């Protein structure tokens, strides 16, 4: 009995500590919940904008634009790179290449086996804002919601503290309560504060539980709630609200001539039905749209994000800052296992290549006209190169001293199909412990299985 009581006190202490850590990370989000400008673009200089939409699917873009001529016009000047591959089908491995380029692909991360994974992950997140503010000419920067920052489920933006020219925020869930106040007619859903309080408690259990039990406790983010409709809505709206308020979160008062923004949003990661044609949350869905994916909730939730993003782009145009803005819209991975463009065979049945087909849309300075498509072989690790091009020549990674470029792509992209997606899934703190035969080198046309060549990576055995 004494031992049981002692164990109980220890666990209670762990829960309190976990909850305290949750509050600390949440408090450092830098946002009070009040909707006001936090992103300050430049009216006269250059704006370089990275929009990271977690799990946004490349193959959905064209049907969305065909469905809405207005949306297509809002994305004027953009090029959709259809032949783009990602390096994994999960954020933990798939996000670092987006932020840090080819030095942070899974294979390259594993080569630096003397450094902890969390340290290399943080390097990737910090690389671009540091380059722009330290190697660029009169740049300030902002970053929001950087996925897995400091390997924390809620991004731990304390990693930005040493860099005063970089502002950092967590917008996820920050505006959820305000959104409900502004949209009281959305539905007869229970007030979100109870759900949030419940999840905060369960999150503390998650943080203090043995690693082997965390996946069970997390239960795909629902924490075993029986109110699945409300949980799905809150999960989606916690991110959607930031997209819906994006115009209100943006002004044009940059204190420096030039501005870099890295904005991450996770709304696409939750499949949820929205009301077409504008794809907005509604208590009753009477119109699912007329695209070929009309019944697909993943399509619907992404359409909601793209429509709000289109409204923001229109806002930039109205304020004269569209032409002086370079914008990249990219994701870490996709989610549909099987897509039409892929020529299906036994190899693709194992790989599920659609999961590695991220959105990659780019608009350069002064670009205009109808959206174009491009079939050049790309990876989402091309993001830093394309954003830095012509602005900071010979850019150098401030953490490694190596040049930032896309030369490693010349030999193809070394993709891992590993299904490990939480930090505790890896048996090493320094490398991704991927199965040796879970690697494929991808090149040229990603839709043909002959261009996915299996390789064995011995270092993954460490």
Regions found by a protein language model. Name each.
Residues 1-462:
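Catalytic domains that recognize anionic headgroups
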């Amino acid at each position: 009995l004494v031992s049981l009581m002692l164990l109980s006190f220890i666990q209670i202490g762990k829960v309190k500590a976990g909850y305290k850590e949750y509050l600390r990370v949440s408090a450092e989000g830098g946002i009070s919940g009040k909707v006001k400008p936090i992103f300050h673009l430049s009216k006269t200089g250059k704006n370089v904008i990275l929009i990271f939409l977690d799990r946004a699917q490349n193959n959905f873009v064209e049907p969305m634009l065909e469905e809405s001529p207005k949306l297509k016009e809002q994305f004027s000047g953009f090029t959709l790179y259809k032949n783009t591959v990602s390096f994994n089908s999960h954020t933990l491995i798939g996000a670092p290449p987006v932020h840090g380029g080819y030095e942070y692909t899974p294979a390259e991360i594993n080569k630096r086996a003397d450094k902890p994974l969390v340290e290399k992950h943080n390097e990737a997140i910090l690389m671009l804002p540091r380059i722009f503010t330290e190697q660029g000419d009169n740049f300030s920067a902002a970053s929001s919601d950087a996925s897995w920052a400091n390997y924390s489920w809620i991004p731990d933006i304390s990693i930005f503290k040493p860099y005063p020219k970089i502002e950092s925020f967590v917008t996820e869930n920050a505006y959820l309560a305000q959104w409900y106040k502004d949209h009281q007619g959305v539905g007869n859903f229970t007030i979100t504060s109870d759900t949030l309080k419940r999840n905060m408690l369960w999150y503390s259990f998650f943080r203090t539980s043995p690693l082997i039990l965390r996946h069970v406790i997390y239960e795909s983010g629902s924490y075993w709630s029986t109110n699945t409709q409300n949980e799905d809505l809150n999960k989606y709206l916690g991110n959607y609200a930031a997209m819906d308020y994006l115009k209100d979160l943006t002004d044009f008062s940059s204190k420096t001539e030039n501005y870099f923004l890295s904005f991450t949003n996770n709304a696409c990661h939750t499949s949820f039905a929205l009301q077409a044609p504008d794809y907005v949350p509604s208590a009753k869905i009477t119109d699912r749209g007329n695209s070929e994916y009309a019944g697909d909730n993943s399509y619907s939730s992404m359409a909601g994000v793209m429509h709000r993003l289109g409204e923001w782009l229109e806002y930039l145009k109205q304020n004269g800052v569209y032409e002086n803005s370079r914008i990249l819209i990219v994701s870490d991975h996709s989610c549909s296992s099987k897509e039409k463009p892929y020529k299906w065979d036994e190899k693709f049945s194992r790989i599920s290549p659609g999961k590695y087909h991220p959105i990659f849309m780019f608009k350069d300075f002064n670009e205009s006209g109808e959206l174009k498509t491009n079939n050049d072989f790309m990876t989402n690790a091309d993001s830093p190169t394309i954003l830095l091009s012509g602005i900071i020549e010979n850019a150098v990674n401030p953490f490694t001293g190596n040049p930032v470029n896309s030369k490693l792509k010349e030999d193809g992209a070394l993709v891992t199909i590993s299904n490990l997606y939480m930090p505790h899934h890896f048996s090493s703190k320094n490398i991704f412990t991927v199965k040796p035969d879970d690697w494929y080198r991808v090149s040229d046309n990603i839709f043909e299985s002959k261009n996915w060549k299996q390789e064995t990576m011995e270092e993954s055995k460490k």
